[in-house]
Curated annotation (Swiss-Prot):
Signal peptide: none annotated. SMART domains: PKS_ER. GO terms for molecular function: oxidoreductase activity, acting on NAD(P)H. The lineage of its organism: Eukaryota, Fungi, Dikarya, Ascomycota, Saccharomycotina. It comes from Saccharomyces cerevisiae (strain ATCC 204508 / S288c). Belongs to the YCR102c/YLR460c/YNL134c family. This is Uncharacterized protein YCR102C. One of its GO terms (biological process) is cellular response to acidic pH. InterPro entries: ADH-like_C, ADH-like_N, GroES-like_sf, NAD(P)-bd_dom_sf, PKS_ER, Trans-enoyl_RdTase-like. Pfam families: ADH_N (PF08240), ADH_zinc_N (PF00107).
Amino acid sequence: MKAVVIEDGKAVVKEGVPIPELEEGFVLIKTLAVAGNPTDWAHIDYKVGPQGSILGCDAAGQIVKLGPAVDPKDFSIGDYIYGFIHGSSVRFPSNGAFAEYSAISTVVAYKSPNELKFLGEDVLPAGPVRSLEGAATIPVSLTTAGLVLTYNLGLNLKWEPSTPQRNGPILLWGGATAVGQSLIQLANKLNGFTKIIVVASRKHEKLLKEYGADQLFDYHDIDVVEQIKHKYNNISYLVDCVANQNTLQQVYKCAADKQDATVVELTNLTEENVKKENRRQNVTIDRTRLYSIGGHEVPFGGITFPADPEARRAATEFVKFINPKISDGQIHHIPARVYKNGLYDVPRILEDIKIGKNSGEKLVAVLN
């Protein structure tokens, strides 16, 4: 099969790559649409992914084979599913989303009740998941958002409860990122907080408020942190959806002055990455790693993350809970820009993400 692999420090389309073998609980899909994520280029640039390993984490397609211990009552050949794959992993280098065939764990696979087709458009606005292009945008961002709210911040999976689950606001820095847009929708539907405060470009304000954001601060403003602190000095729940050294400093400064606060990071940044003079005893940094949901330890660069059964349980429960909400249109995919040359467009997609061409949208390649 064709696949996009890491070769000499680059993403390269290669032919004659073996189709991945199926482990227990996995299904094989004919991959029909894929989406890029920052972690894809990071696996190359930071030498996390092994040479020859298949890249890609977001895939949508049609089941062509059931692996061992897959109940045919739950998944059948011909079903349309979309799911997260740890592409270019040390443990399973022969499996990734950017390939003609991919293996997906049924534990965290989203299943469509209907056939998913190609829309054929160059640009896809946010909306219900009714197409392969839309489905490909979902797995990484929505599953990550679900983990942040349940595993890290302790929300219950209750749909539209009458009172907020937490007596305080949440701050989402990077509200227009893929994870940010998913978090806004979920925080709104789970009624998790008294307010949803987002930091994003003003151009995304209309969409983010439609999702449920209460107030937007523009990160372009030099005094954005001061603006936030002036209006809200009690933020105990904060998520850094951009997740770099600079945004960590800014998010950390927005945390409540006195009461305990948690900043959730999506990378390996810790308190050690916060400038010494800004560190505070009342602020804790927690992390969500989607790679931990596989149920096994994860070698990652020079670190090995231990198996995390609780993260796996949380992800499993979340996918089961949210799947029907996606199917009936209550959760939307984010905007997408579609590339029409299949796997051959993937290296370009990764470069476009790296240089920031994906503002407020996912970049999707269709394999038709």
